[in-house]
Design a protein with these regions (language model features):
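Membrane-interface alpha helices of multi-pass inner-membrane proteins
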Residues: 141-146, 186-201, 212, 237-241, ...
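Membrane-interface anchor segments at the N-terminal boundary of transmembrane helices
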Residues: 103-115, 331-415
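Multi-pass, polyprenyl lipid-linked donor-dependent membrane glycosyltransferases
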Residues: 37, 109-116, 140-175, 184, ...
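Transmembrane-helix signature of polytopic, membrane-embedded enzymes
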Residues: 90-103, 121-147, 165-166, 180, ...
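Extracytosolic helix-loop segments that constitute the early lumenal/periplasmic catalytic or substrate-binding loops
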Residues: 40-70, 74-77, 81-94, 274-288, ...
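Loop-to-helix entry region of an early transmembrane alpha helix in multi-pass inner-membrane enzymes
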Residues: 73, 77, 88-122, 154, ...
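Membrane-interface transmembrane helices that cradle and orient dolichyl/undecaprenyl
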Residues: 131, 171-187, 197, 216-221, ...
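Membrane-proximal stem/loop segments at transmembrane-domain junctions that anchor or position
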Residues: 51, 258-361
Length: 460
């Protein structure tokens, strides 16, 4: 066996042991489940998919649900497939997985989450190696990914974050190969990977133009015409899955949309822009800083601020106000999807008309999005969320500096994924910290690359 083949075997075995071992601790010693609020939607969709092949958010008790486009189909389809293959008894209620952790539904969610986490760790390690990291950096990435409190929590709940993290990490790996190898197969894999991610979370559509730009820039050894053809193939393959699903939605709902929530997301951000303009930037920053002393000081200094008041009675905050209007606009006889799209257009109009206000709000929203990673429960009452966030941000900045200084296209392709997702959420959503969870494997990979260094390979 050749030396490099031996190293590859050791690499694969090491990653498999670290990834599977750490991930499957979720099955035997799961941490405390923290509901995120979307579990019922995904369980309903998965149950109907497994029972009748219909994508619907109707209550589980509904025997003949009407097809809809309320959520992206990726995770419900995967969970339904796992249920069918495993012969799992379908959940009788949306809350069964949480009320009874030993139920078949709950166990299957954890098993699927563990497999996705192990896959994410393995692909993340391969991406780090492709970006120029050595064996130590790759194995360290796998260990950090599977130890991540936020990713482990995502593996426990029926939601799209775990699947999105696996696919996002695959996109980074494929992009690294695509910008350094002129063969068409890596362009095809890049396009397919980038095309599948929006079927789990619509925000990842931003990866399609990002990937097209990368294919135009590298490999530098190719003439411009060759790079244009590669970018065109990538874009075609990346757009195809979303276009197919949107065509399905056009047939069943009458609207060419990816999911029936994009307008709500944009309008919630527009309402947040208005609230920050009224109440100030600093109260928002204080409310979203994960340090209890800072939050208390902010509440004392600005008692009129309502950023943390998720109350459905009374004024509430930007989120409850926007959602109340969203529901009001969708009441029969209105077309709910048309109402959602109308609110989305209204929000985009506000962003353009009040650009400075939007940019000021973006600073606060970007701050909020930094805190995706959780502090380990074992360290309570010590909370390291803030420290970990700054550490991850510094690592990405450091890795970015290495990429620019060395004109390292491999490292640039690796970082393009988390940076594009971060900017998208900072500009267009309220950026709940969990929105950044799918990018955490690459953030931890940036840590190992920043600490261990990345070997330069400018591409061919």
């Amino acid at each position: 066996m050749r030396p490099h083949s031996t190293r590859a075997v050791y690499f694969a075995v090491g990653i498999a042991i670290v990834g599977l071992g750490a991930a499957f601790t979720l099955l035997f010693a799961p941490p405390r489940i923290v509901p995120i609020g979307d579990e019922a939607d995904y369980l309903r969709a998965a149950t109907h998919q497994a029972r009748s092949g219909v994508h619907s958010s109707a209550p589980i008790s509904e025997p003949a649900p009407r097809p809809d486009a309320y959520r992206e189909p990726g995770y419900p389809f995967l969970l339904a497939t796992a249920w069918r293959l495993g012969g799992v008894d379908l959940p009788r209620t949306e809350a069964e997985w949480l009320d009874d952790p030993s139920s078949p539904a709950a166990r299957s969610v954890r098993l699927l989450g563990a497999l996705l986490l192990a896959l994410t760790a393995a692909v993340g390690a391969a991406a780090v190696q492709g970006a120029g990291g050595g064996f130590v950096a790759s194995v360290a990435t796998a260990a950090l990914v599977t130890a991540s409190p936020a990713l482990r929590q995502a593996a426990l709940t029926p939601g799209s974050e775990g699947l999105t993290a696996a696919l996002v990490t695959l996109v980074a790996f494929a992009w690294i190969r695509g910008v350094t190898h002129p063969t068409w197969r890596w362009v095809a894999l890049s396009g397919v990977a980038a095309g599948l991610v929006p079927l789990t979370r619509g925000a990842t559509l931003v990866l399609i133009p990002t990937g097209a730009v990368l294919m135009l820039l590298a490999p530098r050894a190719l003439p411009l015409g060759g790079r244009l053809r590669r970018a065109a193939l990538f874009s075609l393959l990346a757009l195809a899955p979303s276009a197919a699903w949107m065509t399905r939605n056009l047939e069943v709902t009458g609207s060419f949309v990816l999911a029936d929530r994009s307008g709500a997301v944009l309008y919630s951000r527009a309402e947040l822009d208005r609230q920050i303009a009224r109440e100030g930037l600093l109260p928002a920053v204080a409310a979203w800083t994960p340090v209890e002393a800072v939050r208390r000081a902010g509440a004392s200094r600005w008692p009129e601020a309502t950023f943390s008041r998720y109350e459905w009675r009374g004024e509430g905050n930007f989120f409850t106000r926007s959602l109340r209007r969203w529901h009001a606009e969708r009441r029969p006889p209105a077309d709910p999807i048309a109402a959602d799209r109308r609110l989305g257009r209204e929000a985009m109009g506000e962003f353009i008309a009040s650009r400075m206000r939007h940019l000021v709000a973006t600073a606060a929203v970007a701050w909020r999005g930094l805190f995706a990673e959780r502090s380990p429960e074992s360290l309570l009452p010590l909370d390291l969320t803030c420290v970990v966030a700054f550490f991850l941000a510094a690592a990405i900045v450091r890795a970015g500096a290495l990429a620019l200084r060395g004109r390292n296209f491999r490292l640039a392709a690796f970082l393009a994924v988390p940076v594009a997702l971060f900017l998208f959420h900072a500009l267009l959503t309220e950026f709940l910290p969990r929105f950044a969870v799918p990018a955490l494997p690459l953030a931890w990979g940036a840590v190992t690359l920043a600490l261990c260094g990345a070997h330069r390979d400018p591409g061919r």
